[in-house]
Curated annotation (Swiss-Prot):
Disulfide bonds: none annotated. Belongs to the polyribonucleotide nucleotidyltransferase family. It comes from Thermobifida fusca (strain YX). The gene is pnp. This is Polyribonucleotide nucleotidyltransferase. Involved in mRNA degradation. Catalyzes the phosphorolysis of single-stranded polyribonucleotides processively in the 3'- to 5'-direction. Residues 646-718 form the S1 motif domain. It catalyses: RNA(n+1) + phosphate = RNA(n) + a ribonucleoside 5'-diphosphate. One of its GO terms (molecular function) is RNA binding. Keywords: Cytoplasm, Magnesium, Metal-binding, Nucleotidyltransferase, RNA-binding, Transferase. InterPro entries: ExoRNase_PH_dom1, ExoRNase_PH_dom2, ExoRNase_PH_dom2_sf, GPSI/PNP, KH_dom, KH_dom_type_1, KH_dom_type_1_sf, NA-bd_OB-fold. Residues 750-759 have a biased composition (Basic residues).
Length: 767
């Protein structure tokens, strides 16, 4: 087609086959500033459109970039499950993909750009075994590269998974089931041909610990470094294909005004006016005292320079920030001393405590310096797990991790309510760190909700959430396979020298060159997140940072272990859940016609019952006896002990007829009490209507007299048997007036078999 340009990137995964990523432009969304379509094996298709406002937002002091991901359910051949049957607010998967796109693209735009830029990636088609997020990264980069913006792309994004000892690019869901580590890496190609890693999002899989126990390669520090190197050739191929399309169809660079933060004279004036006061303020260890002094010094700038720089107040504020950044970095690189007086490898003071909130199922408080995280765990029936209506093949989510960041955590006012993208991203990171150590559904049949409350913040609340959540889960009785801790690392690069910082503060995050978060057990990395502002980080520097993070992680785990080192007993306030396995062909009997049987069991025991398609039944109740009563009732139906002749039961009359009454002995097992036996209960008198002497719901002790070849039960009242037994030795008469005799008619007493008495599980609950 005329005006349509395309290029392919072929990814060779050896014995795992090849993946073909095709970039195309000129066919769809032609009115956007830049548009591109990315295909994965011609089965998955993502359209990205980049648009730019005509005029800059001069009043803004930040870059107004917006990234949106639109999941269309038709991409998977489905209709949305909402009431209106159309897509609504973005799913968590879509929001996390927005963040994956934003993080490498935002620093690639020229600093000072103030035109609004919007990137919209729409998932148009999705193979059920594919993941669309990395395709969206490449599509967004391609459309932005074509738009003629001041953009230092292209950016290549690739997911690599460690499967059977090999790093596989663009793995499928089925391949990830056999992977021990999963990494999304984004970067760009430098002029020297090397690849600058700009963003990493990595995690162990739910199967990692099992696979490692079976002999697979575990995700340790060396493995992660190798994975980053393995991703670089794939990124090169992707960037080369994008560049081919951009050279053929890209718009010429447009003229966009660049707003610099300050002029040189403003910086020089600020430095001369308050250099010494600012340097002294930055040596104050306490955050609140330091910020109060910084506010005073900042006010001093306005006082001294306002007249000379009238109308340029924003420049003075920007120059003040730039000078602060310079002084913080100089002190770290030259003296090895940080803002709060620590060395580069020092961790702030740590505090760990469990059971800090009454009545909740599990709670913990983790403090690292001024960062303070509350972890709260709630357990419930599996039917309470989250139902997911997204393009992800997983339809339910058993472990739910929510992260809250209220404005008071930093001593500020602000909006509270629905979670922002940052909160969703931090919660997802903490969730990924913990999923590999969670017990399976079979081992622990509970839905688990974990909430992290960041009630105090000065750096790395997401990693603090991992620590607090680990302790909270163990306090709730969740049998974690191992304890997990997290640490945030930073990096300063000045004059060819790299300095790695352990346990960074919020200010060090803002003024540093890298934010590097690592979570894991003593032996394995379970989650990792990296964002860098540099063109690239040497492999040896990254490997050193990983080792430094491991030492800090082990120190934190030691403190956590002092608070709790093994799972506690499940809280008395948490529901008790039992599991019963029944044959699949018995599920219908347990449910009963129109749910009659299962509703009856739930009503009588107070338990909640969930039935899986494979015959697994989960029983939840507020106390153990109720759950056990429900389990006994289910077993009596699906795994019954058949009544035998001579056994006695406390039964319940469930039906009356002209010839007698049917008595329920066990759920689903009724027997006939013939009218002749009912007559004996009433002195042998004639009975016109059974309903006159016996009513539905009445309790009656009966004995199984006979079981015919069809399994039908004939019953006799225990009181009749006992009356006959008393009358027989004295030659007396039975209740119907006839003398009791043996088979020969001589009236001799016959030996009776030993009887056992049972009560029906349904009726015994009411006695």
């Amino acid at each position: 087609m005329e005006g349509v340009y395309s290029a392919e990137a072929v990814i060779d995964n050896g014995r795992f086959g090849t993946r073909t990523i095709r970039f195309e432009t000129g066919r769809l969304a032609r009115q956007a500033t830049g548009s591109a379509t990315a295909y994965l094996d011609d089965e998955t298709m993502v359209l990205s459109a980049t648009t730019v406002s005509k005029r800059p937002k001069e009043a803004l002091d930040f870059f107004p970039l917006t990234v949106d991901v639109e999941e269309r359910m038709y991409a998977a051949g489905r209709i949305p499950g909402s009431f209106f049957r159309r897509e609504g607010r973005p799913s968590e998967d879509a929001i996390l993909t927005c963040r994956l796109i934003d993080r490498p693209l935002r620093p690639s735009f020229q600093k000072g750009l103030r035109n609004e830029i919007q990137i919209v990636a729409t998932v148009l088609a999705l193979h059920p075994d594919h993941l669309y997020d990395v395709i969206a990264i490449n599509a967004a980069s391609m459309s932005t590269q074509l738009a003629g913006l001041p953009f230092s792309g292209p950016i290549g994004g690739v997911r690599v998974a460690l499967v059977e000892g090999q790093w596989v690019a663009f793995p499928t869901h089925s391949e990830l089931a056999n992977a021990t580590f999963d990494m999304v890496v984004a970067g760009r190609v430098l002029d020297n041909g090397d690849v600058a890693i700009m963003m990493v999002e990595a995690e162990s899989t739910p199967h990692t610990l099992r696979l490692v126990a079976e002999g697979a390669i575990g995700p340790n520090e060396q493995t992660v470094a190798e994975g980053l190197e393995a991703a670089k050739p794939f990124i090169k191929v992707l960037c080369r294909a994008q560049q081919t399309v951009a050279e053929a169809a890209g718009k010429p660079p447009g003229e966009y005004p660049i707003f610099i933060d300050y002029q040189d004279d403003a910086y020089a004036a600020v430095e001369e006016a308050i250099h010494d006061e600012l340097a002294a303020a930055l040596t104050i260890a306490d955050k609140q005292e330091r910020e109060a002094e910084l506010d005073r010094v900042k006010a001093l700038v306005a006082e001294k320079l306002a007249e000379d720089f009238e109308g340029r107040e924003k420049e003075l504020a920007a120059a003040f920030r730039a000078l602060t950044r310079k002084l913080v970095r100089e002190r770290i690189v030259k003296d090895g001393v940080r803002i709060d007086g620590r060395g580069v490898k020092d961790i702030r003071s740590l505090t760990a405590e469990v059971n800090v909130i009454p009545r909740v199922h599990g709670s913990a408080l983790f403090e690292r310096g001024e960062t303070q995280i509350l972890g709260i765990t709630t357990l419930n029936m599996l039917r309470m797990e989250q139902t997911i209506d997204t393009l992800n093949p997983e339809r339910t989510k058993r472990y739910m991790h929510n992260y809250n960041f209220p404005p008071y955590s930093t001593g500020e006012t602000g909006r509270v309510g629905a979670p922002k993208r940052r909160e969703i991203g931090h919660g997802a990171l903490a969730e990924r760190a913990l999923v590999p150590v969670l017990p399976s559904r079979e081992e622990f049949p509970y839905a688990i909700r974990q909430v992290s409350e960041a009630i105090g913040s000065n750096g790395s609340t997401s990693m603090g959430s991992v620590c607090a959540s680990t302790m909270s889960l163990m306090a709730a009785g969740v049998p974690l396979k191992d304890m997990v801790a997290g640490i945030a690392m930073g990096l300063i690069y000045e004059d060819g020298k790299y300095v790695t910082l352990t346990d960074i503060l919020g200010a060090e995050d803002a003024y540093g060159d890298m934010d590097f978060k690592v979570a894991g057990t003593r032996d394995l990395i379970t989650a990792l997140q990296l964002d860098t502002k540099l063109d690239g980080i040497p492999a040896e520097v990254l490997a050193s940072a990983l080792q430094q993070a491991r030492g800090a992680r082990l120190a934190i785990l030691d403190v956590m272990s002092e608070a709790i080192n093994r799972p506690a007993e499940i809280s008395p306030h948490a529901p008790r859940i039992l599991t019963v396995k029944v044959p699949i062909d018995k599920i219908g009997e347990v449910i009963g016609p129109k749910g009659k049987m299962i509703n009856s069991i739930q009503d009588e025991t107070g338990a909640e019952i969930t039935i899986e398609d494979d015959g697994t039944i989960y029983i939840g109740a507020t106390d153990g006896p109720s759950a056990e009563a429900a389990r006994d009732a289910i077993n009596s139906i699906a795994n019954p002990t058949m009544p035998e002749v001579g056994e006695r039961y406390l039964g319940t009359v469930v039906k009356t007829t002209a010839f007698g009454a049917f008595v329920s002995l066990l759920p689903g097992k009724d027997g006939l009490l013939h009218i002749s036996q009912i007559r004996k209960m009433h002195g042998g008198q004639r009975i016109e209507n059974v309903e006159d002497v016996i009513s539905i719901g009445e309790k009656i002790h009966v004995e199984v007299r006979d079981i015919d070849e069809r399994g039908k039960l004939s019953l006799v009242p225990v009181e009749v048997i006992e009356a006959e037994a008393v009358a027989a030795p004295n030659g007396g008469e039975s209740p119907n007036g006839a003398k009791k005799t043996d088979a020969s008619g001589n009236g001799a007493k016959q030996p009776r078999r030993r009887r056992r008495t049972r009560s029906s599980s349904r009726s015994s609950e009411n006695t």
